Amino acid sequence: MTDKRFSPDNTPPDASSPDSPIDTIAAAQPPVSPLTYADDMLNCQALKQQLELFQLWLGSEFRSGVSAEKLIDARTLFIDRLLQRLWYCHGFENIAQTALVAVGGYGRGELHPLSDIDVLVLSQTELSDEHSQRVGQFITLLWDLKLEVGHSVRTLEECLQEGRADISVATNLIESRMICGDVALFLTLQKHVFSDEFWPSPTFFPAKITEQQERHQRYHSTSYNLEPDIKSSPGGLRDIHTLLWVARRHFGATSLNEMVGFGFLTEAERKELNECQSFLWRIRFALHLILPRYDNRLLFDRQLNVAQLLQYQGEGNTPVERMMKDFYRMTRRVSELNQMLLQLFDEAILALDASEKPRPIDDEFQLRGNLVDLRDENLFIKKPEAIMRMFYLMVRNRDISGIYSTTLRQLRHARRHLASPLCTIPEARQLFMNILRHPYAVSRALLPMHRHSVLWAYMPLWGNIVGQMQFDLFHAYTVDEHTIRVLLKLESFADEDTRPQHPLCVELYPRLPQPELLLLAALFHDIAKGRGGDHSELGALDVLEFAALHGLNSREAQLVSWLVRCHLLMSVTAQRRDIQDPTVIQQFATEVQSETRLRYLVSLTVADICATNETLWNSWKQSLLRELYFATEKQLRRGMQNTPDLRERVRHHRLQALALLRMDNIDEEALHHIWSRCRADYFLRHSPNQIAWHARHLLEHDTNKPLVLISHQASRGGTEIFIWSPDRPYLFAAVAGELDRRNLSVHDAQIFTSRDGMAMDTFIVLEPDGSPLAQDRHEMIRHALEQALTQRHYQHPRVRRTSPKLRHFSVPTEVNFLPTHTDRRSYMELSALDQPGLLARIGEIFSDLNLSLHGARISTIGERVEDLFILADSDRRALKPELRLKLQERLTEALNPNDKVPLS
């Protein structure tokens, strides 16, 4: 931004200047310049009123369509003049060799509605006590006016000393701007700051690069987090500031326009950066207008208000998704320009030895250091397929770490002038498939192709998902960023270092006959999101067209299409179906058809879960997928029509458990008395180790009294809690409510009742971070559950407070009964808004309707829960249609997201 406020002596323009933003911006009631305030207006109450009027005017002007740039200029000028008026009011003009200096964002002239006002009180020598007291009164008044003022009081020598020691202080001084006071003193500061002794460019530049890298790492090196920081996330305003800081220090350029004059920015690049900055300023300005205090994070609860203020249209979450798509696309452009221009600066500032010549690779490319460079700068325009040749070169040559800046500039130019997508060129298609077949296809080629929008240039379908967000708590990244992370995760399965986290996938991945087909499926698995309809079905059709264009045979095309169509199948089956039911395994195996397809699918499933949200993957999900994988593998080897003999499994489990117990020299007569009370389902659905663990403690316990056991070792990835208690109505609700109150999430429940009315319930629980129950909480949880079990009358459990994030989402309650192979059980799927005490409320309704619960599988997907419940009526039969309808009505009424959840 060109700073029009600078006059030759670095003082602000006069209030009556025709260039003054306050005067030129049309408004019903433009604010009065603070320079015109009478002395009797210079009190806290009157000034506060003027500031409030000014903020209201900013909002009104913005809503009427005035640009953020003009309003930012207006606020900067307004604050300049207010500080000048107060400076003179406090008598500072009578104090020799002092100056008031704007630093930081205020120095750049970038005051958004809630921006900090950072000032430096500069003096030649240390201030006297009287003058220091006067400065204190000046700053205190600004604080009393509720201005976010950051200040420092330093002598000239202190500024230089602290600036040399701290890059942040140095940066503030580099972008400092005179407000009022001793001009000669300020110019002396400027002379020192821009001298070769004060942070010379070869030192300043690497320090700012390191600072940027550390900042990017704090945001997971992506601007695609769904709650980005407009200022600090990669591709945000700070990345533009970094370019300006470096240019200011090295070239003395004070604006993007001047960078063009120095030859380090083309006119097109300046225009693009200005466009990006203007967009980011507009969003940041709108965000500040809706917030009570300074913050630059686009949190979920703010996004809809900002989108509406910016006049994005559409139903439901559409305005948010449209705004965020624009945001992510802008930050992509900033990131690419930032990378390219900093590399150009690097070459200018830290110039390599001129005698070091580029090393030829072939007729078209050469190496400059470890960066690939064009030998003919017009190659990409003349032969667009050479773009793909460059990336194929990058995947094969491990010495290449990136693209040289001038080549990147040519790539950007050629990309914008393509007559048709790259995939229409036969040689480009062959090169793309060659890239996919390489072991490092993702990290060395597909990732940089995505960063530089070449994937988009290759296949236009990819462009549809670039920046495509989903307004929920489940997906942590945009669709394109998520897809790239899936691909990177798949590539990591070829690395032995990944084995501790993903032992099954690392074992299976090398056995895939054509890993490139898995990468292709991953590339397309979410390609149809945001287009309406079933994205899995649409994507499966898209990839068939792609496969035909790229010469895949029928078998290869059908496999990739099936993987895209069924990429959610294994995740849904493992987490939301009863995978201990042989019929479920048989149905899943029928869909999978072969062990080879099973290996492809489990690899894609694990990568998809991990890349959706880092918090989703835990040992519980890992155990479910392993269990489903091995059960399906066994079914496929046994043959589709052969089902396991359940009676034989019951007998086997009893014998194995007995063998374990005999090692403890137990009373077998007492044991058989306990086991005679248990139904066959109990032995079928517990492992021999679990059965032995229960029996060992029951033999030492009065079996007419409640017993609570908590496993010390993780079982199936979570902590197992076993409850033995006289069965009674609302027992499940009481236990679930107590576990929820203790901030434990239930992921699985197996509910059994013995022949003589004892509940034998098993719960798998996890801490909020997905880890098993902390050892130091075992005794407290056990005691709390025992108390809940011994209460004579059921009491509604006290409920935790709702997470602030959940308040901004609405999930309609949906109840669906699955087709079943038995008349003894009903399988009910429930989808609802996650909320404290949810499982207890569901349990209460089951008891109200006299239903018996036999099992539950609990999945929390962001703000949504998707649960499976296995139910029977009072006659131990499947629910009749009228009872299903009644249950559906009760659940929908009770779990309506508009209902208020009681607070503790």
UniProtKB/Swiss-Prot annotation:
Query: Which parts of the sequence are annotated with region: Uridylyltransferase?
Result: 1-360
Q: Where is the composition biased (Low complexity)?
A: 8-23
Gene3D superfamilies according to UniProt: Hypothetical protein af1432
Q: Where is this region: Disordered?
A: 1-23
Activity regulation: the record says: Uridylyltransferase (UTase) activity is inhibited by glutamine, while glutamine activates uridylyl-removing (UR) activity.
InterPro entries, per the entry: ACT-like_dom_sf, ACT_dom, HD/PDEase_dom, HD_domain, NT_sf, PII_UdlTrfase/GS_AdlTrfase, Polymerase_NTP_transf_dom, UTase/UR
Q: Tell me what reaction this enzyme catalyses.
A: [protein-PII]-L-tyrosine + UTP = [protein-PII]-uridylyl-L-tyrosine + diphosphate; [protein-PII]-uridylyl-L-tyrosine + H2O = [protein-PII]-L-tyrosine + UMP + H(+)
The name under which this protein is listed is Bifunctional uridylyltransferase/uridylyl-removing enzyme
Q: Which SUPFAM superfamilies would you find in this protein's record?
A: ACT-like (SSF55021), HD-domain/PDEase-like (SSF109604), Nucleotidyltransferase (SSF81301), Nucleotidyltransferase substrate binding subunit/domain (SSF81593), Poly A polymerase C-terminal region-like (SSF81891)
**Which residues does the annotated region (Uridylyl-removing) include?**
361-719
Q: Domain notes, please? A: Has four distinct domains: an N-terminal nucleotidyltransferase (NT) domain responsible for UTase activity, a central HD domain that encodes UR activity, and two C-terminal ACT domains that seem to have a role in glutamine sensing.
